[in-house]
Regions:
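Structured mid-to-C-terminal alpha-helical surface segments
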Residues: 1-121
Length: 121
């Protein structure tokens, strides 16, 4: 038999969410934003809020970034309103056609919604 190791959806989302929240406007990895948005759109109904919250807490503890979580929504506002981040998203859209019709506002709303899901547990 072959063992296959895999992360569950909540862990994948939590790792990307933690990266977005802890790096804020220094995160140039637009793929994290896209992945978080598209995974939440495709699999949103299957996300278990308690599992997502636990995975986010565990990821933040492991990475030493717990201090960023209480200000997550303010960080989202800062990221969304950053002209540099919008420019990076526009460049990502031009490079990858699959993202061309997804607005920056829509992507950031997905980020906020996933964080709110953690708060609601």
């Amino acid at each position: 038999s072959i063992d296959i190791w895999a992360y569950n959806l909540e862990t994948v989302l939590a790792e990307k969410l933690e990266t977005i929240l802890s790096r804020a406007t220094t995160n140039t990895r637009m793929r994290d934003f896209y992945d978080l948005h598209i995974l939440s759109q495709l699999h949103g109904s299957g996300i278990v809020p308690g599992d997502l919250a636990a995975a986010l807490d565990a990821t933040a503890r492991k990475r030493g970034s717990e201090k960023y979580l209480p200000d997550a929504l303010a960080v989202c506002d800062e990221v969304e309103n950053s002209p540099v981040m919008l420019e990076l998203w526009s460049a990502y859209q031009k490079k990858f056609s699959y993202a061309s019709d997804i607005s920056w506002t829509t992507v950031m709303e997905s980020v906020r919604n996933l964080y709110r899901m953690c708060q609601g547990r």
